[in-house]
Amino acid sequence: MAIKDAFNKMISYFDTDGVSEVEEELSSKKQEEPVTKSQQTSRPNQQQQAARASQPQQPKQARPQMQAQQRPQSQSRAAYAERPYQGQSQARVSHDYNDRRATSAPSASSRREQYQHAAHQEQTTIALKYPRKYEDAQEIVDLLIVNECVLIDFQYMLDAQARRCLDFIDGASKVLYGTLQRVGSSMYLLTPSNVSVNIEEMNIPNNGQDIGFDFDMKRR
C-alpha cells in the first residue's frame, strides 16, 4: 500500500506538471492570440489610414487642374452669354433708330401736306372773262361766290349790254362783300372779300365817272 501511494503521488506529480505545462502553453497561446489579433487589426487600420492619406492628396492635385479647366469654360460661357446681350443691344439701337426715322418721316410728309394745303388755301386764281352777252354775267358772279378773282374785259359787248352787266355784277359784289374796280378803259377787276388790291392812279378816261354808268367803252 505504501508503494502504491508513492507511485500515485509520483504519477500525480508528473500529471500536475503536465497540466501546468499545458495550462502555461494555453495561457501563452491566449496571450499570443490577442497580440496577433491586435496586430492584424492594427495593420488594416494602418492600411486604411495610409489609403486615406493617399486619397486626399489626389484631389488636392486634381483640384487646381479642375479649377484651371473650369476657368476657361466659365470665361467662354460668360463671353457666349455676353454676345446675345450685345446682339440684343445692337438690335434695340437699330430698332429705336428705325422707329425714330419712321416717326420723323411721317412728320415731314405731314408738314409738307400741311404747307401744300395752306398754300393751296392761300393761293388765289384770277379768271379772265370776255363777256359777249348779258347771260355771261351770271358766270362771273358764280366765280366770285367760290372766292375767285375775275378780270372782266367788255371790249366785245355793246354799251347797253355792258352797262347791264356792270349793274348786275356790282350788285352781286356788294351782296357777297366783294369789290369791283376799274383797271383799264374797258377792263374791271372783281375780287372777293379776302383779297385786297392796291391800284396806282392811272390816267383813265372818265375816271371820275361812276362805274355803273361808264359808257365810254372802246369796241373793236
Swiss-Prot record:
Annotated signal peptide: none
Location of the protein in the cell: Cytoplasm
Main location: cytoplasm
Biased composition (Low complexity): 39-79
UniProt feature, compositional bias: Basic and acidic residues: 26-35, 93-102
Any one Gene Ontology BP term: FtsZ-dependent cytokinesis
Ranges that cross the membrane: none
A cellular component term, taken from the record's GO annotations: cytoplasm
Keyword annotations from UniProtKB, A to Z: Cell cycle, Cell division, Cytoplasm, Septation
Region (Disordered): 1-120
InterPro entries for this protein: Cell_div_SepF, Cell_div_SepF/SepF-rel, SepF-like_sf
Protein family per UniProt: Belongs to the SepF family.
PANTHER family for the chain: CELL DIVISION PROTEIN SEPF
Chain's role: Cell division protein that is part of the divisome complex and is recruited early to the Z-ring. Probably stimulates Z-ring formation, perhaps through the cross-linking of FtsZ protofilaments. Its function overlaps with FtsA.
Subunit-level organization: Homodimer. Interacts with FtsZ.
Protein name as catalogued: Cell division protein SepF
